[in-house]
């Protein structure tokens, strides 16, 4: 825990392992807390329509604080920024444990997550460089997916046993993330001394948006990652209505198992990308993006469980192979132009706006009576065409 260190190019340095450990615990807590809080709301007889509002508040925090969190990450040592952000998550979980309105507590967690994201990705480019950055992103994505899987399951299982116990475990996990942050070396701030007045901060953020958008490589990365995560959150909701219609299974658990197959595939795809793609060969990931859309279309017409599981696993592999190189490209190019923290903050804004837009289109389709299978086919086709268009546009630029 030295006060100042130079970048260690080793992929498995103590600092890098501390970052991965902190990320696993933080993401585990996020997903476990969601299911534990939903169980609490059910126990307190909150109306069903109020449950999605939790996710909206979480996403809304990313959008609302996007102009500020990138500068926050770049103005201080990123390991300490991560610690403060996890402390906010701990505070939010603690509030829910002590009976504070769950929307207030979960909003605090969302603010912590918004502050955490630019720092957790930005620090990778400070701890390692070059092609190892792609591998570091693979480790980050793999640990995140593992945390999503285990956290979701743990939150649901513990909440079935005892809701308060589940909430306390979430708070303890966030506490563990805070402790893990202490082992991240205190690297120099990337951009110290920036103005903290509202107008200069917003001007700085939107200036970063313009800078990244004018650069062909970073624009390419921003559009690709936004499409991917917007599609990912939409697929999660699509599975809930698709399973009863296509498979005739009304269990609440089955959509969770199918989502788990996607997550496992992303881990495998992220590992493959770390070995096969470098910053100079990022375009290799684009066919995988097109195949994501094709896999969704093929999945939508399935009527039996085994092929559905297999296609979702394959979809996840394509997804992991697609997203990891794009993340690494944005971090590397953004670090030298607007700062890694600002680059990730801009990325978060794009991704969360894409989530809201895609969910809005999905909700509109469902509300006018489009069948789930048709929604899946249309969704997959639009995604494949969008990625293909992005690829062609990127090559021309």
Curated annotation (Swiss-Prot):
Catalyzes the facilitated diffusion of 2-acyl-glycero-3-phosphoethanolamine (2-acyl-GPE) into the cell. The keyword Transmembrane applies. It comes from Klebsiella pneumoniae (strain 342). This is Lysophospholipid transporter LplT. It holds the Pfam family MFS_1. InterPro entries: LysoPLipid__transptr_LplT, MFS, MFS_trans_sf. Keywords: Cell inner membrane, Cell membrane, Lipid transport, Membrane, Transmembrane, Transmembrane helix, Transport. GO terms for molecular function: lysophospholipid:sodium symporter activity. PANTHER family: MACROLIDE-EFFLUX PROTEIN, MAJOR FACILITATOR SUPERFAMILY (MFS) PROFILE DOMAIN-CONTAINING PROTEIN. Gene3D superfamilies: MFS general substrate transporter like domains (1.20.1250.20).
